[in-house]
Amino acid sequence: MHDPSELLEDGPAAVRRLARRRYDLDLAALEKAVRRRSEAQAEVTRLRTELNRTSRARGRSGPPSEEEKEAARALRADVQQAEATARTAGHDLTELLLGIPNVPLDSVPDGDTDQEAVEVRRWGRPPHDAGTDARHHSDIGESLGILDGPAAAKLSGSRFSVGRGAGARLERALADFFLDLHTGEHGYTEYSVPFLVNRDTMTGTGQLPKFEDDLFRTQVGDRELFLIPTAEVPLTNLVAQQLLDARALPYAFTARTPCFRAEAGAYGRDTRGILRLHQFEKVELVRVCAPEDAPAQLELMVGHAEECLRRLELSYRVVQLPAGDLGFSARMTYDIEVWLPGSDAYREISSVSDCGTFQARRADIRHKRADGRKAPAATLNGSALPIGRTVAALLEQGVREDGSVLLPEALVPYTGFRRILPGGATA
């Protein structure tokens, strides 16, 4: 969420920056909402002052008359009405601000889609010459007997998956490998968090109110909860409504959770395989820091996600997203795209985003500086990594001419095997 005074002060510059992400900022509506709230708050202050003044005056002049009692009752009613008006004005301003996305950094390139992302670097090379025919991961997994799409469809419908035998073991191994790397070498603290959260928690990280159609919601009686679309939501909100000691920053959190997404805008896309599911597992990274440290923290987190892929010997590239393709809460994002021979393309496997103070203002995450000033902190988040997409990449990059899949050496301590053979046997 934004500080409205900053948006109004920036004026046309704020309009221009938000237009880069195809958002039309209505300065006149914002100014009207701010003025309405200010005037309502001023009226509350005026009436309370008047009520206090008359109360003190009556106390000095003896018992009040019936006329004075009636005047006092009327004044108290006016105060209550003014307070209600101020609450409404404040609510209306908050609702307006909650719908305004983060402002892209000036260094973010122009453009509207991931096709206009700017490549930053590559690691490895697309294994066209690996001596194998390019095959889609769903074909590989089903031929090995480790992915069962029909079973998933029978249980839950489209966009779900079932892993079996060595496939399920591989998923568990990847999650443990990622968590061990992040906690043992990258300095993150692991958390076990709820998968169901309330509306305030979803609002704090920016999923609500704008993206309610993309979320799975539960309702039991009058209790409403949402299934998390990413562990970013509970991890970031661990420090919601808190004043943090700047000397303790940065905080670094990680968690492995299932993620639930309705994928309302993805009709017809990636209907085969395990790239785009309603439910998938992911290891998430979240960092909370002083705002001036956010750029360096972003680069650090990208490096942590890249290290996962390098240890797994998976070819990938890093791209910077254009302004029009940024997530609602992000002011800058790097996507890491892994090479998928079966698609003959790089596909996103991680997004790492700098949200600046945007989420912190929504969730009331502040830090106390050395000089005593209290100010919003900065938040960052990134995938490192989603389990299903990593499995897809390992299958497509690791398949051999005999139909077996060779896994990276780094996973052997976690899987207990290096190769998955046709029929699901391991070696």
Swiss-Prot record:
Keyword ATP-binding on entry: yes
Gene3D superfamilies: Bira Bifunctional Protein, Domain 2, Serine-tRNA synthetase, tRNA binding domain
InterPro entries: aa-tRNA-synt_IIb (IPR002314), aa-tRNA-synth_II (IPR006195), aa-tRNA-synth_II/BPL/LPL (IPR045864), Ser-tRNA-ligase_type_1 (IPR002317), Ser-tRNA-synth_1_N (IPR015866), SerRS_1_N_sf (IPR042103), SerRS_core (IPR033729), tRNA-bd_arm (IPR010978)
Binding site for L-serine: 230-232, 284, 383
Gene Ontology CC terms, in alphabetical order: cytoplasm
GO biological process, one term: selenocysteine biosynthetic process
Pathway membership: Aminoacyl-tRNA biosynthesis; selenocysteinyl-tRNA(Sec) biosynthesis; L-seryl-tRNA(Sec) from L-serine and tRNA(Sec): step 1/1
Positions bound to ATP: 261-263, 348-351
Pfam families recorded: Seryl_tRNA_N (PF02403), tRNA-synt_2b (PF00587)
Superkingdom of this protein's organism: Bacteria
Keywords in alphabetical order: Aminoacyl-tRNA synthetase, ATP-binding, Cytoplasm, Ligase, Nucleotide-binding, Protein biosynthesis
Span list, region Disordered: 35-72
Listed Basic and acidic residues bias regions: 35-53
Catalytic activity: tRNA(Ser) + L-serine + ATP = L-seryl-tRNA(Ser) + AMP + diphosphate + H(+); tRNA(Sec) + L-serine + ATP = L-seryl-tRNA(Sec) + AMP + diphosphate + H(+)
EC number: 6.1.1.11
Gene Ontology molecular function terms on file: ATP binding; serine-tRNA ligase activity
Location(s), subcellular: Cytoplasm
Coiled coil regions, renumbered to chain: none
Enzyme's top EC category: ligase
HAMAP family reported for this sequence: Ser_tRNA_synth_type1 (MF_00176)
Subunit structure comment from the entry: Homodimer. The tRNA molecule binds across the dimer.
Family the UniProt entry places it in: Belongs to the class-II aminoacyl-tRNA synthetase family. Type-1 seryl-tRNA synthetase subfamily.
Protein task: Catalyzes the attachment of serine to tRNA(Ser). Is also able to aminoacylate tRNA(Sec) with serine, to form the misacylated tRNA L-seryl-tRNA(Sec), which will be further converted into selenocysteinyl-tRNA(Sec).
Domains as described in the record: Consists of two distinct domains, a catalytic core and a N-terminal extension that is involved in tRNA binding.
Protein name, entry field: Serine--tRNA ligase 2
Organism name: Streptomyces avermitilis (strain ATCC 31267 / DSM 46492 / JCM 5070 / NBRC 14893 / NCIMB 12804 / NRRL 8165 / MA-4680)
Organism lineage string: Bacteria, Bacillati, Actinomycetota, Actinomycetes, Kitasatosporales
Originating gene: serS2
